[in-house]
Amino acid sequence: MMTTIPNLPDELESEILSRVPAKSLAKWKTICKRWYALFRDPRFVKKNLCKSAREVMLLMNDRVHSISVNRHGIDDRFEPSMEFSGKLRSLIDSKDVKVSKEANLARSLNTMYAKLKSNRISKLCGGVMNHFNIR
């Protein structure tokens, strides 16, 4: 005899899933159509980004470093920004960073979205835009 769990209300399911790390959510998007749609909803992405721990890519002395930052409970009224100058000569390999054909540093799932070509950092609640849609 198989025991089934009754369906959770959508709000509760969304709240629980918003606390799951984005790497796991990316793997789960094919579980069901409802979750796939939820993970693509910009409100859910923003909620997940606001609740997740932060990782930041820092360019220092021609090296790229990954720094984890837990901002839970910190006032988010300001958006910190960084400006990089100079040329990137090498990239330290990281399983969380994908480098596209256009030589852009792109989308570490719980980090930021940065285009080295233009030296701009796009932020959504201190995290990444296109959080779950890796190109």
Swiss-Prot record:
Enumerate the InterPro entries for this protein.
Answer: F-box-like_dom_sf (IPR036047), F-box_dom (IPR001810), SCF_F-box_component (IPR050796)
Q: Locate the F-box domain: which residues?
A: 2-48
Task: Quote the PANTHER family the UniProt record gives.
Answer: BNACNNG10540D PROTEIN (PTHR31672), F-BOX PROTEIN CPR30-LIKE (PTHR31672:SF13)
Question: What is the name of this protein?
Answer: Putative F-box protein At3g17270
* Species of origin: Arabidopsis thaliana
